[in-house]
Amino acid sequence: MAGYSGTPQVKKLGIKSGFNIALVNAPRNFALHLDLPTNVTINLKTRKPLDFALLFVKSEKELTVGFPQYTARLTPGGMLWVSWPKKSSGVITDLSETNVRTIGLAAGLVDVKICAVDDIWSGLKFVFRLQDRARVRSV
């Protein structure tokens, strides 16, 4: 896993004990390397609200389909990470930090952090704006 300053990946991503999370299209064995905290539930198949979702996408089309689906499942304080291939990875993609951010902002979320998810994937973290969290809670 890529890292900086020795910070564990799970801490960089903000996954905490008791979280209900989704890892969407994650690379094989990705979850095994996260060293998840206790009581974290990886949840893809049910419709339970998510504290954390990480979408691995290679195309703008994938992102425009997946972003609203997982935004709708977030808790008011939840976070949605979008991960796309780094330019240096050699993976073919039409995504960049700019268009990932544009799609997220258009969906009503705000980006608050960027990091290397691993040697291939970059990640951008989105959350609901503070003033929107009460509205999300009531939906």
Identify the residue ranges that each predicted region occupies.
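Class I S-adenosyl-L-methionine
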Residues: 108-139
